[in-house]
Amino acid sequence: MEKDLVIIGGGPAGLAAAIAAREAGVEDLLILERDSRLGGILNQCIHNGFGLHTFKEELTGPEYAGRYIEKAKSLGIPYKLNTMVVDLASDGSLKKITVMNREEGLYEIEAKAVILAMGCRERSRGALNIPGYRPAGIYSAGTAQRYVNMEGRMPGREVVILGSGDIGLIMARRMTLEGAKVKLVAELMPYSGGLKRNIVQCLDDFDIPLKLSHTVVDIKGKERVEGVTIAKVDENSKPIPGTEEEITCDTLLLSCGLIPENELSDSLGVAMNPVTSGPLVNESLETNKEGVFACGNVLHVHDLVDYVSQEAEQAGKKAAVYLQGGLEPEGKAIPLKAVNGVRYTVPSSIDISRMEDLQTVRFRVGNVYRDAKVEVSCNEQTIRSQKKQILAPGEMEQVILKKSELEAIDNLEEITFSIKEL
């Protein structure tokens, strides 16, 4: 089978990218989705808060996904469900995608361009090295969310949550609304990993304690969780002896970070960012592999699905431009350097000759900063400065760069992003 464009993943990123590519003139494209339905993780996110930027109204996850699914179907975009991509390789300008499903078995698709939109997965207990037995009652927050919201099953009645990522915060509220008692949320870092609005709406409004600089050091119970031991940690994240506290519970939910799912990217030889665990991309969201683009949570973990859709639309448009022969490199790639509190930037390089008039650069900081400013500089010249009352790792930030400003700078070698405290 041959295709001009294949989108791997039928979640919010894959759908938005496919729609943008079709509207930009790509007729021969295909979405590959391993689940039994389109929509990705949004299908289990039945809470509201989606769509405020994209649709200017508040939607639930399934409602948000439904609008993109309807649009994709109205445009006649083909898709395959229950279809797993098991390998991705490059053969010159063509990309070879090895695919498997029940109806057609194992087969290969050759594509001129590929958009990576595989999303991310949760960090498991094994990756956290929590001591103790392995009893029933330990779940990732996303697994518990699927059980409650899609399958109508309650994971437990007395709950402790480790990690204050957005999924964990939302599940603290969800479990409470379903009748469970959420004893507390413990967070290893001295700050929350979630959005401020989720801390207020999901914890404060329900009087659920948030213990910062705490972690789980032991799990009690052999057949079923009977309790956990938490302890305060020092500045090196090591438990402090004598601070242990035993909490009775029958369920432990883990919300300890998300990891972009990039096994396929690795098999293709895509260059990866060690900070985000996602691909390094340029201003067109193209990886180091020609004709391979990345967007959404496979690129870097987002706070809001609206930003995923915006990013994916750009990837879809640029893939269309590539297929039409319009992405030939004309200038040199200018690296974007993250220093002084900025952990990374997306994109990681910009070819000014190929960038749009306005280029969005998204980034995260590595700590909590109050009364600070984000500075963007080129050749020791500040071209952008934004004052911020607060900057936190749990909130993605962005800066808009103007093509005209960058073109006016002589001998531009790199663009530096940094945090300056006032």
Range-by-range predicted roles:
Residues 1-8, 66-158, 234-242, 253, ...:
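FAD-binding core/adjacent interface of flavoenzyme oxidoreductases
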Residues 362, 394-406:
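Exposed aromatic-hydrophobic patches
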Residues 116, 138-148, 251-302:
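FAD-site-proximal beta/loop scaffold in flavoenzymes
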Residues 374-376, 404-422:
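Short, aromatic- and glycine-rich surface loops/edge beta-strands on solvent-exposed regions
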